[in-house]
């Protein structure tokens, strides 16, 4: 069984204190930091860009798990790679050529993640599972923090776990959205090994 990892999201953090927030999370035992990048187009919210990630990366050693909710995503991959992303996760709906975008991320020696929204089917990515490092299952509709967990997505997590076991694959299964002490165990039991949440969950791993 894979080690359970916690990737705290900075989406709800005090953006004027991001450096201190990340340092606090790192010292608290986080395995990585989840950075949500939104463009106001692919999702209805705006967050941070490459210069902020680059500045933050200078002051910490923890891995940055960067979730790109931007379209078209392909042309921004290099900028986020250069900024210091360790994992770059993209949505299949945000690129005209998912395989080419996966290869581009790999060309910068970054780990590749592909994200599925609550309504997105596994069929969208099943042909690429051998080529990626991580599948991110959204358990809320992307765009804003603080939404309620959608338990129906756990069926998708279970399906991915079955594919992983059947075909002897090694990708991580990450879940993001409304994860808390009431539901994290069900996410783990379904097959998730990376939980995106706040500081409160750090010590469960």
PLM region spans:
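Active-site/ligand-binding-proximal alpha/beta "capping" segment
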Residues: 141, 148-189
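Residue microenvironments linked to proteolytic maturation
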Residues: 108
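Conserved small/polar residues in nucleotide/adenosyl-binding loops
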Residues: 202-205
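Short gly/ser/thr-rich secondary-structure transition/capping motifs
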Residues: 115-119
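Conserved N-terminal beta1-alpha1 strand-loop-helix module at the mouth
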Residues: 1-89, 93-97, 104, 112, ...
């Amino acid at each position: 069984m894979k080690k359970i990892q916690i990737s705290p999201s900075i989406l709800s953090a005090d953006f004027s204190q991001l450096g201190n927030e990340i340092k606090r999370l790192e010292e608290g035992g986080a395995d990585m930091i989840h950075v949500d990048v939104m463009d106001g187009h692919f999702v209805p919210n705006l967050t941070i860009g490459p210069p902020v990630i680059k500045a933050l990366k200078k002051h910490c050693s923890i891995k940055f798990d960067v979730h790109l909710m931007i379209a078209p995503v392909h042309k921004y991959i290099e900028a986020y790679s250069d900024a210091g992303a360790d994992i770059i996760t993209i949505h299949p709906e945000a690129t005209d050529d998912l395989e080419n975008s996966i290869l581009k991320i790999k060309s910068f020696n970054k780990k590749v993640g592909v994200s599925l929204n609550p309504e997105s089917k596994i069929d969208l990515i099943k042909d690429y599972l051998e080529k990626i490092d991580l599948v991110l299952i959204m358990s809320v509709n992307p765009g804003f923090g603080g939404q309620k967990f959608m338990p129906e997505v756990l069926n998708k997590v279970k399906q991915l776990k079955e594919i992983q076991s059947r075909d002897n694959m090694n990708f991580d299964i990450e879940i993001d959205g409304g994860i808390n002490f009431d539901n994290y165990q069900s996410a783990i039991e379904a097959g998730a090994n990376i939980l995106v949440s706040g500081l409160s969950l750090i010590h469960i791993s």
